[in-house]
Amino acid sequence: GKVCILGCGNGYDAILFSKKGFSVTAVDFAETPIHNLETNAKSLSLSIETIKKDIFDLTPNYSSQFDYIIEQTCFCAIDPLKRKQYSNLVHDLLKVGGKLIGLWMPLDKDIIDGGPPFGVKENEIKKLFSTKWKITEDCFPIQSIEARKGREKLIIFEKL
């Protein structure tokens, strides 16, 4: 399947999914992490499409292109006022039946405390993705790094 990783940073997820046989597109606006990912992918003989641009500039070129979008640290990094725009973006990028696989965090921080990372509330996420989506998974991850234990939740949304 085709995977898109928004706000990919150094691309550790991109490398993992590529090693598992997925076709990966990794997006970040920062030049250094994209360069690091390209260097690492090349050294591992992996083919990963990298895009250096703002995630909100991906449509219409990438509309309905992906089976999966991986969300880990992008949502909490963007301006909270753009969260509705983010939900529209991922809906547009995914094929019908595609999945937004999100590790949503930090759940224990309020938006008013600033960021990034900006606080994320479970009810806000579910409300944002309440129409045109169905939840297929909703749990605290079995494994979390110590600093994130209990502060992140795995919620997978399927595009209807």
Residue ranges with predicted function:
Residues 1-62, 78-160:
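Class I (Rossmann-like) S-adenosyl-L-methionine-dependent methyltransferase catalytic domain
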Residues 73-77:
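Short catalytic micro-motifs in class I SAM-dependent methyltransferases
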Residues 70:
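A conserved beta-strand element that flanks and buttresses the S-adenosyl-L-methionine
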Residues 65-66:
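Local beta-strand N-terminus motif with an aromatic residue
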